[in-house]
Amino acid sequence: MRKILAKHGYEVWARWESEAEIFELFSDSDAVGYIGFAESIAEAIKIGTWHIEEQHSEATWNGS
């Protein structure tokens, strides 16, 4: 498991799943907050960036 992004107080962690040959993405290092999966680290970063921006946007919209 390795942290691939951190921004606005949010993190994205990636874990390589060798059997399926994908990266599983999580919002924490304990692999509790599942985000999705990606076939490459570049795709994982794109998905992670989108996830963080969505979380930040929702928090900003709700006044958090």
Where are these regions (language model features)?
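Stable alpha-helical structural segments in soluble proteins, enriched in small hydrophobic residues
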Residues: 44-48
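Short N-terminal "domain-start" leader segments
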Residues: 1-22
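Intrinsically disordered, low-complexity regions enriched in Ser/Pro/Gly/Gln/His and often acidic
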Residues: 6-9, 43, 54
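A short, exposed loop/beta-hairpin motif centered on an aromatic-Gly-Thr core
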Residues: 28-43
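Short arginine-rich
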Residues: 49-62
